[in-house]
Amino acid sequence: MRVHVVDPPAYTPPYDHALSSALAAAGADVTLVTSAFPYGEVPRGDGYRLDERFYRRSAGAPGGTLRRLTRLAAHVPDMLAYRRAAAAADVVHLQWLTVGQVDERLLPRRPLVLTAHDVLPREPRPGQVAAQARLLGRMDAVVVLSEHGRGRLVGEVGIDPGRVEVIPHGVLDHLTHVEPDPLPAELAAVEVPVVLCFGLMRPYKGLDVLVQAWEGIGDAELWVVGRPRMDTAALHATAPPGVRFVERFVDGGEAAAFFRRADLAVLPYREIEGSGVLATALAFGLPLLLTDVGSFPEVAATGAAELVPPGDPVALNGALAGLVGDPARRRALAAASAAAAAGPYAWGPIAERHLALYARLVG
C-alpha cells in the first residue's frame, strides 16, 4: 500500500511524523509530503520518505505578513505540481488544506482521506465554513479524532456517516526520548508542585479562565508556556501570585524539561477536537485536568483526567486546589495516563485502523 500523508502548511508535524512512522512500521510504503517547519527541528521517525515540496521559496519571518503572502502565492502551483506527483500513491491522506475555496478544485484524482483535526474552523473567515463543508464532501473518507467530532460532522456538516471514521490521536512520545535541557535557574529552584499549561497561547484555550481560577491556590506554581498568538497583557495584569509566563516557542530538550518537571497538566480549553499537547502529556504519563470539550471526555473515561466545565473558573479552582493538595490522586491519574498511552492511544493499533480504512477505499 503506497500512502502519501500530506500536510502542506506543516501545521502538525509531530502528528504527521508519528503517523507516517507508524504506518511504515505496519507495512505501508509511506511518503510524508509537507513543507519545512519554520520553528525548529522536528524529530523524524523511521521507515518513510520525507518530501518537503511545498512553499520552498517562502520569505519573511514565521507568522509574518510577507511569509503568509509568499506561501499563498506558491500554493496553487505547488498543489498543481503535487496533484501530478500523487499519481504514485494508492491513497492520499490529507492532514490540512489551508485555502479551502481553492483546494477543492486542486485535489488529486486518487482515493482521498482527510483527518479533520478541527471539524470546522474556530475563527472562520467569510465563506470559509461553506468551503470546508464542500471540501469534506469531496473526500472518500474523513477521519475524526473522537465520537464528539463524528457527531458534529454528521449533524452540523451533513457528512454521510458511512464515510466518517473515528480514530483517536495517538500519543506524541518524541520528547520522551530527548535529553531534557536544564530549566532556567528561576524555574529550576521551584520546589512546590508545578501545574503546566503548555502550547500556543490562543483565545480559545481559556487562559483567562485559568489565570482567574488560580486565585487562592497556595503552595504550588502555574507555568503558562508557549508562543503567544494573542494579546497577553490582560493575563499579566490579572495573574495572582504563583503564575509564571514563558512566552516563546519551546521545543526539543527545553520542552521535555517542562513536561518532566510538571506535576499536573491542565488544558482549560473552551473548544477543541484533538490536542497535540494532550497527546504529549499522555506520553509523559502526566495526570491531567481537562475541560469537558471535544475528545477530552473520552480521554477522561480512561481514568487519566479529571473534567471541569469549560469557562467555569470556580469549578476549575476547586479541581486545581483538590489535585494540588492530593498527591495520591495525582499518582492514580498518572498511572491511568501511562496505561492509556500504552493502550488505546498507542500508534500500533491506530496505524492498523488507518490501513484497514485505506484498504476499503482501494478495494
Enumerate the language-model features and the residues they cover.
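N-terminal strand-loop element at the rim of the active site
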Residues: 6-74, 83, 100, 149, ...
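Nucleotide-activated donor-binding/catalytic signature segment of Leloir-type glycosyltransferases, i.e.
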Residues: 233-256
